[in-house]
Every structure is written in C-alpha cells, then in structure tokens.
C-alpha cells in the first residue's frame, strides 16, 4: 500500500486509529523540501501547521518503509516529502468554497501561481479560512486562518534558489470523551462534557490555540545528469 492511499485511509477512518504497517506515527517522517518537520519532542508531524493549505501541499512524494528514494533513508513507517518550490505549481488561480458538518461548517481557499516566468522567477500564494460557530458536537467552535507564500528564482539549468513560508493560526473548542451512562442520560452520543454556560453564554473549558509559523530556503544544484545537490534550511 502506498503512503498516499494509507494517508487517505488514516484521515477517513481516524476513529479506528489506522496505522501504517501497525506502527505509531512517530515512525513515519514528513519532509518539506527535503527538511524533516517532525516535532522534536513527540516525533510526530503536526498536520495543524499546514491546515487549510490543501492546494499548497498537493505536490508530494510518498514512499514505503526502506524504499529507495532521493530525500531520506526511509523509516519503518514510510515517509512523505512535500515540494513547496514555487515553480512546481501550475500557473493560474483557484477559488473554492465548501461546507461540511464536522469540526467546521465553512471553508474558503484561494490560490494563485504565476508559474515559471520568462525572467526565471516564480511566485505562488494561498490563503484559507475555516470557521464554525458550533460544529456537529455541541459546545465546539472552530476559527482557523492559513497562509502560504513561495518565491523561486531559476538562474539557469543548474542553479535555483527558493523560499517558502506558511502558517495556520487556529483556535478551536475540543470535545471530550464520556461514559455510556452519560450518553444515556443526555439521550445523545454527541454529548460533550467540556462545555457549559457561563454568564448566560456557552463556554468550552478546553480550547486549543496553535500557531507554528514556518519558513524554508532551498538551493538546488544540478551538478550533472546523474548527480544533484539539494540544500535546504528551515525553522518553525
């Protein structure tokens, strides 16, 4: 099973706690332009840092465990490399508006890319917003903005420099686990013990606020037809 397919299964069947090859997520690595972005404390990649940037993160390569590739030695859980070089995005613009009845109810995204211009420059930008005054679970809310900006200069057939920065400031109310007895008394399996009324207004006691602004710079050097040097430095 390829990483792309298993990622889809992991998202769609997350309540079943799907795991690639049975390994925990810290055994799967996620790279961006060749730089490992797994958290140094948990060992896991935080998908919240690229939340709402679907168009900006579409260019990716996925590998299985120990599979031959050009960006890592290959961990036992597989790896993914997201390519955020501006010249790799198709020229044009895209606007999308969607609704759902899960964590958020409304999502808007806009992406624009120049493609590779005649002067060797390429620019790509993306903005996104996800919102819910209250999700399908009572007492939850969702307020998230996301941005992405990339620029690249292709000097010739051998050298190019690129820069990308992105972030997704998010604030959301969490749902909490409960017991079958509580669900029975509430007459609903959507019962959420994390919320209540304070001064006549709904208040969630578990609010998550996250923001990991990130940036990465890359230099690509095609030494010859059989050898390439890719150097990247990033931070978050």
PLM region spans:
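Extracytoplasmic beta-strand/coil segments of soluble accessory domains associated
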Residues: 4-36, 65
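Residue-level detector of the transmembrane beta-barrel scaffold of outer-membrane proteins
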Residues: 29-31, 61, 92-94, 122-126, ...
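Extracytoplasmic loops and strand-loop junctions of Gram-negative outer membrane beta-barrel proteins
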Residues: 62-64, 92-96, 130-134, 194-204, ...
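Transmembrane beta-barrel wall of Gram-negative outer-membrane proteins
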Residues: 99-132, 136-175, 207, 213-223
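Outer-membrane beta-barrel and related beta-rich outer-membrane complex signature
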Residues: 137, 162-198, 236
């Amino acid at each position: 099973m390829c990483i792309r397919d298993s990622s889809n299964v992991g998202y769609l069947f997350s309540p079943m706690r799907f795991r690639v090859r049975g390994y925990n997520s810290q055994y799967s690595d996620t790279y961006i332009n060749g730089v490992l972005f797994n958290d140094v404390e948990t060992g896991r990649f935080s998908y919240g840092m690229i939340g709402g940037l679907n168009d900006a993160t579409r260019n990716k390569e996925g590998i299985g465990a120990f599979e031959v590739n050009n960006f890592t030695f290959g961990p036992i859980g597989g790896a993914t490399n997201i390519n955020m070089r501006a010249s790799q995005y198709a020229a044009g613009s895209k606007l999308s508006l969607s609704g759902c009845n899960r964590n958020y109810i409304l999502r808007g995204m806009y992406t624009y890319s120049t493609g590779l211009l005649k002067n060797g420059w390429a620019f790509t930008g993306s903005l996104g917003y996800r919102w819910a005054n209250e999700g399908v679970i009572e007492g939850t809310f969702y307020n998230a903005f996301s941005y992405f900006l990339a620029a690249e200069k292709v000097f010739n057939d051998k050298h190019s420099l690129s820069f990308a920065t992105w972030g997704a400031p998010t604030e959301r109310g969490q749902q909490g686990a409960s017991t079958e007895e509580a669900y029975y008394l509430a007459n609903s399996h959507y019962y959420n013990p994390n919320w209540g009324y304070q001064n006549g207004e709904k208040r969630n006691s578990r609010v998550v606020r996250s923001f990991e602004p990130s940036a990465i710079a890359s230099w690509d050097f095609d030494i010859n037809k059989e050898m390439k040097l890719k150097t990247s430095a990033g931070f978050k």
